[in-house]
């Protein structure tokens, strides 16, 4: 293996060169790899991604960034932290194996120090373990677990660390969380063994990396503009919600009271005209009291309900988050070819949810692909 070969583990980017490892005889290569990794002498560059909460990230960064600066300088690893408006953050550590393990040691010991400090003001007598969460491509988790759980059992027994591989993938990704708990020394040994497994078993296909979503902030609509509430002020919302809301009001207006929607004959319409909905949205002030919640019902053919729900509920959850409406899908009724959807919220919430549902249906019926 030549100098400068770059490997991404355990979180491996799609363009990695890990596939070159598959040409080596596996058992002999594995022993040689494990020995070199343990000694910190394997000449590869690793990228390991950690999932941390805000408090943990704050501990790593330190006052004015002094702690993370010290970790970078003393370990020789590159340590990058994802943007700060998310409850969860991704900490990416890149470098040669010895630099990676030094960085991990510093992080683990820093967390242990935090635990000891927190216990000084607590009646607890037993010290809780240090816990780190790695982000690993789901296609590599099988190798990490091993046949019948043999590999993960071996790692637990040889390092003394507790290792748990999440059963579900992280949202909107093909990665899983691997939680490691124990003493700092046990965690370091565990990470070394996990790196060996990841290097021996490259990910299959492209990996969709997990990207934590920003913390949700209240959104209100006024005068066709979306605003987020920050403290006592309403700040214009910068993303696409405003455009979506405008589209919703233009393309799926509330028909006059008593009329049905020609696109969905069984649909019961809300008791608001388009003009009334606009008035209720608070044209005069961005901080007017929210309009009263109303309920909107529609029926969808059974053969189209899947495109609304999405795999494991991903699409309906997206529609809920983007619209701010409560959306309930009734269970299938025997003998019925349709399912009822109930949307509850303000007229603006309902209108946006209806637009997004109609867009999904149009996409499915016309074969335009997923939105």
From Swiss-Prot:
Which Pfam families does the record match to this protein? KH_1
Which InterPro entries would you find in this protein's record?
KH_dom, KH_dom_type_1, KH_dom_type_1_sf
Give a yes or no for keyword DNA-binding in this entry: yes
Q: Where is the KH domain?
A: 45-95, 129-182, 293-357
Record key words, sorted: Cytoplasm, DNA-binding, Repeat, Ribonucleoprotein, RNA-binding
Q: Which domain of life is it from?
A: Eukaryota
Molecular functions per Gene Ontology: C-rich single-stranded DNA binding; mRNA binding; RNA binding
Q: Does the keyword DNA-binding apply?
A: yes
The Gene Ontology biological process annotation of the record reads: mRNA metabolic process; negative regulation of transcription by RNA polymerase II; regulation of transcription by RNA polymerase II
Q: Name one GO cellular component term.
A: ribonucleoprotein complex
Give its localization.
Cytoplasm
What this protein is reported to do is described as: Single-stranded nucleic acid binding protein that binds preferentially to oligo dC.
Give the protein name, as stated in the record. Poly(rC)-binding protein 3
This protein's species is Homo sapiens (Human)
């Amino acid at each position: 293996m030549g100098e400068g070969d770059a490997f991404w583990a355990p979180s491996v980017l799609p363009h990695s060169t890990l596939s070159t490892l598959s040409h080596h005889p596996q058992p002999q290569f594995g022993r040689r790899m494990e020995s070199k990794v343990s000694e910190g002498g394997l000449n590869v560059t690793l990228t390991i991604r950690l999932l941390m909460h805000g408090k943990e990230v704050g501990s790593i960064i330190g006052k004015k960034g002094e702690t993370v600066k010290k970790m970078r300088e003393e370990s020789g690893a590159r340590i990058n932290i994802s943007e700060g408006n998310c409850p969860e953050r991704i900490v990416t550590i890149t470098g040669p194996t010895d630099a990676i393990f030094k960085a991990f040691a510093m992080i683990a010991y820093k967390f242990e120090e935090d635990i000891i400090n927190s216990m000084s003001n607590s009646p607890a007598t037993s010290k809780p373990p240090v816990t780190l969460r790695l982000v690993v491509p789901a296609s590599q988790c099988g190798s990490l677990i091993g046949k019948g759980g043999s590999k993960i059992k071996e790692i637990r027994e040889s390092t003394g660390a507790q290792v748990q591989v999440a059963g579900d993938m992280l949202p909107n990704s093909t990665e899983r969380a691997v939680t490691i708990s124990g003493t700092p020394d046990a965690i370091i040994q565990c990470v070394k063994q996990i790196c060996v497994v990841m290097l021996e078993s490259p990910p299959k296909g492209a990996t969709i990396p997990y990207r934590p979503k920003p913390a949700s902030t209240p959104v209100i609509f006024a005068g066709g503009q979306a605003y987020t509430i920050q403290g006592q002020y309403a700040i214009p919302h910068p993303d696409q919600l405003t455009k979506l809301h405008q589209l919703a009001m233009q393309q799926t207006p509330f028909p006059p009271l008593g009329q049905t929607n020609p696109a969905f004959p069984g649909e019961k319409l809300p008791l608001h005209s388009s003009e009334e909905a606009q008035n209720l949205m608070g044209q005069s002030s961005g901080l007017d009291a929210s309009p009263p919640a109303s309920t909107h019902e529609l029926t969808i053919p059974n053969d189209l309900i899947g495109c609304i729900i999405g795999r494991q509920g991903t699409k309906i959850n997206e529609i809920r988050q983007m619209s701010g409406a409560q959306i309930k899908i009734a269970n299938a009724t025997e003998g019925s070819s349709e399912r009822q959807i109930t949307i509850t919220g303000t007229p603006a919430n309902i209108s946006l949810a209806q637009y997004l549902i109609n867009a999904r249906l149009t996409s499915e019926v016309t074969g335009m692909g997923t939105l």
